[in-house]
Amino acid sequence: MKDIKTYDNKNILVLGLGKSGFAVSELLLKLGANLTLNDKADLDKNEKAQELKAKGVRVIGGYHPVDLLEEEHFDYLVKNPGIPYENPMVKKAEELDIPIITEPEVALSCSDAPYVCITGSNGKTTTVMLTQRILDHHLQKTGHHAYAVGNIGVPISEVVPKATKDDILVVEISSFQLLGVTDIKPKVAAIVDIYNNVHLDYHKTFENYVDAKLNVTRTQNSDDYFIANFDQKDILAKEKEVSPAKMQTFSETDHNADYFIGDEYLESQDEKIMKIADIKLPGVHNLQNSLVAIAIAKLMGADNEDIAAVLSTFTGAKHRLQYVTTLDGRKIYNDSKSTNIEAATVAIPAFKEPEVLIAGGLDRGFTFDDLVPLFKKHVKSIVLYGETKYLLADAARKAGIKEIVIVNTLQEAVPRAYELTEPGDVILFSPACASWDQFRTFEERGDYFVRFVEELKTK
């Protein structure tokens, strides 16, 4: 870890505990900062908060001490990415011109290990996992490692102290995290895709959302690389305006891109890299994710043998077209990460077999007309639950689906979907909606889906 002096003896307020709040607090202590930790939750019995308190951190829980920002001098406010900028502490810090930063920027500023950053509306976690595995396969030959960190669930601050200059950090970075970033310099940055109707409750407008995503490349150097989606022309034009890095592109269909999906192979302008039939992950979107991972991994030193070793064995990230089981000839997949319409549009065409689809969730005020052509082509029957069940049913009727079953809960939906199938079919859980009407997170929703599938085996 670099012994930077940026935060040495500086007064810093960490806003929001959580996983990343705890990790960045520990890192800042190592860097010599004077810390105050604040969370609106009561922290008196919180083990992590008390652990920090024992190390000299001032811990304030149960409320936001807005006046404290005026009464005392703070050099930085480190904000948990999930906390909106409307938060009174954040607003007051802005009024007082206190720099507001996030955990990734703090951690990456002192990383000895080179790092790559991957973001996107859909596909970033799978791409991060593929990239990390390929690079780890490459680095293990010399006794070193690639670490998957960031929005994937492992705070960057947790890994930076142990990662050496010969390791590589593969960082999944979200729009929430990027919004607060002012200066990161990944060796390679990538935007897998950008879609509308994603996190607009946080960013307010699509333009704000795109601007946040572009922070992944905005402060790169001219000898760094940026991987861009050749098929999203409007976004590509903005990326070309903003990015100072050397650009490489990938495409599903256009063979003018640097990396593309050929008839039988994943290809670059220079070579055929890997036979598509040998890749375990289902769906065209996962071939695109694979192209991004390949582009990054090659720039960081991996070869085709490293790539083949991973792509021929990796079966997917949890909750992302995750294969669950085969039950009486029916393959069952958990795609709970499908929290928006765009995610469902890549999951539904992923299979050649007839599909019974389970969908539904939080109503964000959208129609589902964009799914009608896919319903018509791929879905033989559909089971719907949650706040959006009737809106989805309208789209299913427009598609001419004859068997439309409406239930109240996911627990009811799973056995009903099984009843509609026959051997050779696929049961696909791809909600096309956020989980918050009935579940706390998409992970919790996916775990319950798997549990309900297991219950089918006992009936």
From Swiss-Prot:
Its EC number is 6.3.2.9. It comes from the Bacteria. It catalyses: UDP-N-acetyl-alpha-D-muramoyl-L-alanine + D-glutamate + ATP = UDP-N-acetyl-alpha-D-muramoyl-L-alanyl-D-glutamate + ADP + phosphate + H(+). ATP binds at G120, S121, N122, G123, K124, T125, T126. It is an enzyme of class 6 (ligase). GO terms for biological process: cell division; cell wall organization; peptidoglycan biosynthetic process; regulation of cell shape. PANTHER family: UDP-N-ACETYLMURAMOYLALANINE--D-GLUTAMATE LIGASE (PTHR43692:SF1). This is UDP-N-acetylmuramoylalanine--D-glutamate ligase. It comes from Lactobacillus acidophilus (strain ATCC 700396 / NCK56 / N2 / NCFM). The lineage of its organism: Bacteria, Bacillati, Bacillota, Bacilli, Lactobacillales. The gene is murD.
